[in-house]
Structure formats: C-alpha cells, structure tokens
C-alpha cells in the first residue's frame, strides 16, 4: 500500500505504508485476516475473487492490483479519496479503464464524496466500474449517487485462459504471500429504485 506525500497530499505525517504480507488478528475471540495480499473467494465456482487496493496504489508504476490479478483476483476494488482538479476525472477514468484492460479484470473505483470536501480539497464522488477496458457504470460527479453494474466474471476467466501471456508472467515469489479467504455465498437480490 502506497502513501502519497506530494502536491496537496501530506499523508505520511499521519500514516505509514502498509506491509505486503498478511497477519491474523484476534478480535472478540475470532481470528480476522489483515494485509495487502488477501484474495476473498465468493461462491462455489471460485470465479469471483476479490482483492483490494487503496487510493494511491492505482497511481503508482507497479500497483498491487498487478500482483492481485496474477494471483487470481478477477475483481479489484479501490477505496479512494481522490480529489478533483482540472482534467483529473478524465485521467482517472482512463487509468481505471486501462488497468481493467491490462489485468483482464473488473475494477471498482470508489472515491470520497462531495460531503467529505474541506476548504483545502474538493471531492467529487467520481465512482467507476470497469470491465476489461470498458466503463460499465460511472457516477455523475458531485452527486454522491450509487453506481452498480454486472461484471461478467465468466468472460474474464475465459479471456485470461485464452491469453497465452497472462499466466506466464506470474513470478513464483508473488504467490508465496497470498492468502485466499472463502467468504459466504453472495445472494442475488433485486433492487427497487425509487
């Protein structure tokens, strides 16, 4: 996990970069896994494999999402606090689209909303869902609206099998630190919008 310390960001005053490994912490008698090398598996097919990166990770030369995807993650979620400046939303959109294309994955990008803005920084709730280089859903800036889309995980798995160069790029050292956590089956439900 990467901590920005440039331009308007001074996060190293309060935060330390995360570690790449994993730890298990006992919370109220239950062991809970924490770390930058976790992949959550959902369902019986083991195709929905979710990994997380945080804000600045996406903007670095070698984002953790590369390791996540090479270790099987089909969906990457980025929890962010990316501010608004001139031209940044277009750049951010291309960054998310490009990462989803390069990694042949679904990429969910969720950033801070306008209610989290201060006198120094403005957040616009620029939330995106991309799949393999295509924007599936995008929030209108400054609306704090929820976005949702269907990510075709079967297609992602098929595309990865078809690409002869996807698996050959896996460095064995990248696989050692990963832990796969099985999560409860996701229930399909219908949303009623009002």
Region spans (language model):
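Enzyme catalytic cores with a strong preference for nitrogen-chemistry domains
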Residues: 1-194
């Amino acid at each position: 996990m990467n901590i920005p310390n440039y331009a308007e960001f001074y996060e190293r005053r309060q935060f330390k970069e995360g570690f790449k490994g994993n730890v298990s912490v006992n919370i109220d008698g239950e062991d809970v896994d924490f770390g930058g090398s976790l992949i959550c598996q959902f369902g019986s097919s083991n195709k929905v494999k979710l990994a997380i990166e945080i804000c600045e990770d996406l903007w670095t030369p070698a984002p953790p999402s590369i390791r996540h995807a090479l270790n099987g993650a089909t969906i990457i979620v980025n929890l962010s606090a990316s501010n608004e400046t001139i031209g940044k939303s277009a750049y951010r959109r291309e960054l998310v689209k490009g990462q989803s294309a390069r990694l042949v994955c679904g990429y969910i990008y969720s950033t801070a909303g306008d209610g989290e803005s201060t006198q120094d920084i403005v957040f616009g709730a620029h939330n995106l869902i991309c799949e393999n280089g295509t924007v599936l859903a995008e929030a209108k800036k400054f609306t704090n609206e929820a976005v949702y889309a269907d990510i075709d995980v079967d297609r992602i798995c098929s595309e990865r099998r078809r690409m002869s160069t996807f698996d050959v790029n896996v460095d064995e050292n990248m696989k050692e630190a990963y832990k796969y956590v099985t999560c409860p089956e996701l229930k399909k439900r219908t949303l009623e919008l009002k």
